[in-house]
Amino acid sequence: MIHVGNLGLDQLDIDDILFNVLKLSDYWIKRLEVPFYTLGRNAYMDGKTPEYFKESKILNPKLVDHFKDLYVNVQVYLTHLIGEQVYLNHEFAYPSFHIFESDPVFLNYPSNWHKDYPYETLGLKNDTSSSFTVVIDIPKSGAGLEYIDGEEKYLAYNVGDIIFHKGNFLHNIARLKEYVAGEYRITLQGHIIRHNDRLIMYW
């Protein structure tokens, strides 16, 4: 159901990614009244809006400039895992980041159990869709994914992990375990789908 691997990122790689996520803070979009942001647009929140396509054209080149090595690592890993070349596609938003700034509200924040259907908002309806997460930064108390596989289960995250799954089962971002000011939960988020006879990764 869920594949967990590791991209082999060292601390210098992680520090560079975090530096650039913060550097691009002008492109963070606050999604709720609580400190939850995305770096740019994504299909599941914005796929039916003109802003998704307009702003992605602006941000995609900046994402490549700042996270080229990360994209290459993800492409190589997923290509090997799936057994078919995976590409970026400029028609859609590139994979980008969930950013949660530590806040006491996340200790008891309501769950959002869901399945992944972002392709439907973009009119990409087919059976090749899958989702991935790359863990970039987590609180010292930990972070993870809750999911249903017969019963409720918990997958603990480690920095550098890449989590790959079909997205067709109930899952939920696990709540913050302990509030410590100044901590973040930052993950690269993306999806894979077949488009024009190629497997592409997008968000």
What are these model-predicted stretches?
Residues 9-10, 102-104, 118, 139-141, ...:
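Short, solvent-exposed loop/turn segments at secondary-structure junctions
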Residues 14-21, 78, 134-137, 186-198:
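Short, Φ-rich (hydrophobic/aromatic) sequence segments
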Residues 1-84, 96:
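Non-heme Fe(II)/2-oxoglutarate
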Residues 1, 130-132, 182-186:
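Residues at beta-strand starts and edge strands
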Residues 83-84, 122-124, 176-177:
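Catalytic micro-motifs at enzyme active sites that drive phosphoryl/nucleotidyl and oxygen chemistry
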Residues 89-95, 101-162:
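Catalytic core of non-heme Fe(II) oxygenases with the double-stranded beta-helix
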Residues 144-203:
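Catalytic core of Fe(II)/2-oxoglutarate
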